[in-house]
Design a protein with these regions (language model features):
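Conserved thiamine diphosphate
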Residues: 92, 140-207
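Short, hinge-like loop/turn segments at secondary-structure boundaries
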Residues: 69-72, 115, 140-144, 230-233
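Thiamine diphosphate
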Residues: 1-133, 196-200
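Flexible, low-complexity linker and terminal segments
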Residues: 1-11, 15, 20-21, 206-251
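Active-site-proximal loop->helix
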Residues: 109-114, 134-148
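Glycine-rich beta-alpha junction loops
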Residues: 57-59, 129-131, 184-187, 216-223
Length: 251
């Protein structure tokens, strides 16, 4: 009786666009997951050789270590301006601006608004963890009301610091953006939806459409002072009511 022939079927493998280098992010941080999702989308679309990543100041400033694509660092808040310049000079490239909440909505608010209003053909991935992570846990534009941080030890007081800024809703008031969606990475279901949104944002560039914006609610256990599992739950309990998930525009 002939021996049975065994076959192997690969059901999961590391994305080609994702480096094998161990990342520097804290345990429970969502950046590593988001990097993987971005790499998967790049591979699926076959655009690794065409992709340029712009990473400004923040926890993600070393993102170029983990994604096997061309990369460029930008000054704090200036990633959309740098991405705009690259895209206009190289319109055939897929340009991704990867930013955090302090970078995108504080020092970089002007660049964010005007790049979106011009309809620049770039893809912005906005990681919202409601805090300044890299610099030690200070209050960010997205910090929730009453949330305690290093610079709001008694909780964010709207009378003094204003309310959390909802980036997706703000950009949805503009006419030019073609895709705006808010996702999360705190559960398997949420991660799958985020993967689809990132792929759509990149696909829009491949099809030479306009500005795409993907906001991702992400965990920062170190900055929040809680355990990773608690951080994932906190997104659903505290952040989602303030930053509702869903698509605001797709055209």
């Amino acid at each position: 009786m002939p021996a049975e022939t065994l076959t192997e079927k690969v059901v999961y493998d590391r994305p080609r666009s994702l480096s094998e280098r161990p990342n520097h992010y804290c345990p429970g941080c969502g950046h590593g997951t988001i990097h993987k999702l971005l790499a998967q989308a790049i591979d699926e679309l076959g655009i690794q050789e065409r992709t340029i990543l712009v990473a400004p100041v923040g926890c993600s400033v070393l993102a170029y270590h983990y994604l096997k694509v061309d990369g460029c660092e930008a000054a704090h808040g200036r990633a959309p301006a740098v991405a705009t310049g690259i895209k206009r000079v190289h319109p055939d490239r897929v340009v991704v601006s990867y930013q955090g909440d302090g970078d995108l909505l504080a020092i970089g608010m002007a660049e964010t608004i005007h790049a979106a209003n011009r309809g620049e053909k770039i893809t912005v991935i906005f990681v919202n963890n409601a805090i300044y992570g890299m610099t030690g846990g200070q209050m960010a534009p997205t910090t929730l009301q009453a949330q305690k941080t290093k610079t709001s030890p008694y909780g964010r007081n709207p009378a003094e610091a204003g309310f959390p800024i909802r980036a997706c809703e703000l950009l949805a008031t503009l006419d030019a953006p073609v895709f705006i969606e808010r996702c999360a990475v705190n559960s398997v279901k949420a991660v799958l939806k985020t993967r689809r949104a990132i792929r759509k944002g990149l696909q829009n560039q491949v099809e030479r459409k306009g500005y795409s914006f993907i906001e991702i609610l992400s965990m920062c256990p170190t900055g929040w002072g809680i355990e990773p599992r608690e951080a994932a739950a906190w997104i659903g309990e505290a952040m989602v009511p303030v930053f509702p998930l869903g698509n605001l525009r797709d055209r």
